[in-house]
A protein has these predicted regions:
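Conserved structural motif at the start of ABC-family nucleotide-binding domains
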Residues: 5-7, 20-22
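The feature captures the beta-strand-to-loop junction immediately N-terminal to the Walker
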Residues: 36-41
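ABC-family P-loop ATPase nucleotide-binding domains
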Residues: 91-168
């Protein structure tokens, strides 16, 4: 099996501070990895670097994703190539409904692959099917993205995004952060 994600000699700085120093990691397609370490050891930094978040300087090393130089890609290109980051603290986006956010991301990926946008009825069927699996009520799809959601509702909503977008690589940063009792049901 070929390398799916290969990180070689990666060093990452935030301002003048080295957060990741000379990291090497090989992940083959289909493998599941848990990266563990104390606070400040670079777990979230690695997640953010893989997703292309600004504010990080790669001082050394390379990241190869499915045979392509990941470092040269913009965040939206990384997402369209199949990288998904579930945030430790999902952001609220007032004025944007949950369903519109997910459909926009879904259609953006379809456009990247040369496909037409999904028909609204087909998307509604898909999102309701996945929402039901996760126990997400229909009314939450019409609410503003993560606005007023509990920690568990936000995490469940990210799980819905993950199921709909079906990425090649899912990076789950602090998956238990902000969970409520209902999330454990």
């Amino acid at each position: 099996m070929s390398n799916f994600l290969k990180i070689k000699n990666l060093s990452v700085n935030v301002e003048d501070k080295t957060i990741i120093n000379d990291l090497n990691l090989d992940i083959k397609k289909g493998e599941v990895h848990a990266i563990m370490g104390p606070n400040g050891s670079g777990k979230s930094t690695l997640s953010n670097v893989l997703a292309g978040k600004n504010g990080y300087t790669i001082s050394k090393g390379s990241i190869d994703f499915c045979g392509e130089d990941l470092i040269s890609l913009e965040p939206n290109e990384r997402a369209n190539k199949g990288i998904f980051l579930a945030f430790q603290y999902p952001v609220e986006i007032p004025g944007v409904t949950n369903i519109n956010f997910i459909k926009t991301a879904f259609d953006s990926n379809r456009k990247f692959r040369g496909l037409d946008p999904i028909k609204p009825g087909d998307f509604l069927k898909l999102i309701k099917e996945k929402s039901q699996i996760l126990g997400i009520p229909d009314d939450r799809l019409k609410r503003q993205l993560n606005v007023g959601f509990s920690g568990g509702e936000k995490k469940r909503n990210e799980a819905l995004q993950l199921m709909i977008l079906n990425p090649l690589l899912a990076i789950l940063d602090e998956t238990d952060s902000g969970l409520d009792v209902d999330a454990f049901k």
